[in-house]
């Protein structure tokens, strides 16, 4: 019979309590002000100086080692091959469920990494911009699958990442509006040779079926040098989603331009019932079928408790 100690020996991750992880900050300086941190967290997410000090500064320090090692390897390979390739951006993926706080993590990392010395250029995109338009999804009968892998323009996203990794200039990505719940026509953002690119999205760690003929099939995560999965229990995620829905009912949904404006007048009870219906019909299914199964593919897992605070950190062994 295999013992717990033996199983731990074969665990691909080293797991740290919050207290253990916080000590790994060492002497990494705090480069963010309290008012900056306050602006970074998403609706109802929790972020304060203590969270940055104990979770994100150690992660920033770790990433500095990874990025430096990647640059040294790139230079060594360039000398070995006797080529003069452009410097390739270091790409970090941030994955996790709806309402888990991916955007908060991505923004904090962008701010911290941009203040390394020397000042690297750090850009951030979300994969929301690569969703198919609502018109396309409606024609394809996929509106209830929005956020599922099949709702994305995967070809466009892979082309974007390939161009970024190749060091091309002025690479453009579509823009998504959370107000209208749709792609913004004729609007793009420009990514111009960043030193580091952070890519945030639900399914960025997902793979697909490999073809029987053995032909190479690229996945989004093939372009990542490091990846972070933000984790929380399913029951916790459900409560966060419902709470966010009620908050949006009182704020963004009140805008007549909002796709969800029809929910602005719902009572608390009716709004919660609608939120749970959407969660159970769409987000929970996507979590179980597509998002959660990608967790073991992450380089680092941040496990949050019900108070939005990271309780445990797991780092994949080299």
Curated annotation (Swiss-Prot):
Its EC number is 2.7.1.33. It comes from the Bacteria. GO terms for biological process: coenzyme A biosynthetic process. Keywords: ATP-binding, Coenzyme A biosynthesis, Cytoplasm, Kinase, Nucleotide-binding, Transferase. One of its GO terms (cellular component) is cytoplasm. Gene3D superfamilies: P-loop containing nucleotide triphosphate hydrolases (3.40.50.300). ATP binds at residues 96-103. It is an enzyme of class 2 (transferase). CDD domains: PanK. It is found in: Cytoplasm. PANTHER family: URIDINE KINASE. Belongs to the prokaryotic pantothenate kinase family. This is Pantothenate kinase. It comes from Afipia carboxidovorans (strain ATCC 49405 / DSM 1227 / KCTC 32145 / OM5). The gene is coaA.
């Amino acid at each position: 019979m295999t013992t717990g100690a033996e199983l731990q020996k074969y665990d691909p991750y080293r797991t740290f309590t919050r207290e253990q992880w916080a000590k790994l900050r060492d002497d990494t300086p705090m480069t963010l002000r309290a008012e900056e941190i306050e602006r970074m967290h998403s609706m109802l997410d929790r972020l304060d100086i203590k969270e940055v000090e104990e979770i994100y500064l150690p992660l920033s320090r770790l990433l500095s080692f990874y990025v430096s090692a990647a640059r040294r390897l790139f230079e060594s390979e360039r000398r070995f091959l006797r080529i003069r390739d452009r410097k390739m951006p270091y790409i970090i993926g941030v994955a996790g469920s709806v309402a888990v706080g991916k955007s908060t993590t991505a923004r904090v990392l962008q701010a911290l990494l941009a203040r390394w010395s020397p000042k690297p250029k750090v850009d951030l995109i979300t994969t929301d911009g690569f969703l198919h338009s609502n018109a396309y999804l409606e024609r394809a009968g996929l509106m209830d699958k929005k956020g599922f892998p099949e709702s994305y323009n995967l070809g466009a996203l892979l082309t974007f990442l390939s161009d970024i990794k190749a060091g091309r200039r002025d690479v453009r990505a579509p823009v998504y509006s959370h107000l209208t719940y749709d792609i913004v026509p004729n609007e793009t953002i420009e990514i111009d040779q960043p030193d580091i690119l952070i890519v945030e999205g639900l399914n960025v760690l997902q793979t697909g079926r490999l073809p029987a003929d053995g032909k190479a099939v690229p996945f989004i995560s093939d372009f990542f040098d490091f990846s972070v999965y933000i984790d929380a229990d399913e029951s916790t995620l459900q409560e966060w989603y419902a709470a966010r829905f009620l908050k949006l009912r009182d704020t963004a949904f009140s805008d007549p331009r909002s796709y969800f404006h029809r929910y602005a007048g719902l009572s608390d009870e009716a709004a919660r019932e609608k939120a749970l219906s959407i969660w159970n019909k769409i987000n929970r299914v996507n979590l179980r079928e597509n998002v959660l199964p990608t967790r073991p593919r992450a380089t680092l897992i941040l496990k949050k408790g019900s108070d939005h605070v990271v309780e445990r950190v797991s780092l994949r062994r080299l």
